[in-house]
Amino acid sequence: MTEGARSTIDQGEVDRFSAMAAEWWSPTGKFRPLHKFNPVRLTYIRDKACENFGRDPKSARPLEGLRVLDIGCGGGLLSEPVARMGATVTGADPSEKNIGIASTHAKASGVSVDYRAVTAEELADAGETFDIVLNMEVVEHVADVEFFMTTCAKMVRPGGLIFVATINRTMKAAALAIFAAENILRWLPRGTHQYEKLVRPEELEKPLTASGLEITDRTGVFFNPLSNQWNLSKDMDVNYMLLAKRSAQLDR
């Protein structure tokens, strides 16, 4: 199969999330875990981006002037707050329903986001490039992880960053992120995640480094039931985030 014929889209996953599109912005709905997860991932993105680009994370618009791609943006839970930080944000999702919800909410909120119903490969083929590519809670829902990561890496500008957040493929993750979260705690609808589609860190790092990027940070993320908050952790057995950077010099 030629690379041009490959696709990152798992239509079953697109259909699953399209069916829940109306609930994206409900903090008590089916996407409640993402609402809870947003503060820790936004802080991580802001701080690491500011460190890389020499910005003040405490300023009102620390990402001013940076072009950001939120791939698999869903209803825009991440795109909107990143845009509020001053970034010029493109939110991409293959689901027309998700993009419709995201666009309507952004307009009502007075936030400017360029939402597009497109795939990662369509953006890459069009020659789009970004200072930051956000790949958050997406890779476990795509059809071809290696091709997806390679495609996303192509869009990272020299000196730019790619953030990835997902769930590790471990028995601990199967017990906590799937069985407990979907069947006991009912945080997520059953079937949201499938064990065989979870992704180990090295399966992300390999295509990123092969694409000329350097892995600069790895962190686990865990939920503290006492504080009802997500926090960074050294434990990457369940939820984790990776950060990679392309050299400021053109290397290919």
Swiss-Prot record:
Q: Which SUPFAM superfamilies match?
A: S-adenosyl-L-methionine-dependent methyltransferases (SSF53335)
Pathway named in the protein's UniProt entry: Cofactor biosynthesis; ubiquinone biosynthesis
EC number of the protein: 2.1.1.222, 2.1.1.64
Keywords, alphabetical: Methyltransferase, S-adenosyl-L-methionine, Transferase, Ubiquinone biosynthesis
Kindly list the residue ranges recorded as spanning the membrane.
Answer: none
User: Which biological processes are named by the entry's GO terms?
Assistant: methylation
Q: Which residues bind S-adenosyl-L-methionine?
A: R41, G72, D93, M136
Q: Does the keyword Transport apply?
A: no
NCBIfam families the UniProt entry points to: UbiG
PANTHER family, per the entry: METHYLTRANSFERASE, UBIQUINONE BIOSYNTHESIS O-METHYLTRANSFERASE, MITOCHONDRIAL
* Its biological purpose: O-methyltransferase that catalyzes the 2 O-methylation steps in the ubiquinone biosynthetic pathway.
Q: Which protein family is named in the record?
A: Belongs to the methyltransferase superfamily. UbiG/COQ3 family.
The identity of this protein, by name, is Ubiquinone biosynthesis O-methyltransferase
- Native organism: Rhizobium leguminosarum bv. trifolii (strain WSM2304)
Query: What does UniProt list as this organism's lineage?
Result: Bacteria, Pseudomonadati, Pseudomonadota, Alphaproteobacteria, Hyphomicrobiales
Gene expressing this chain? ubiG
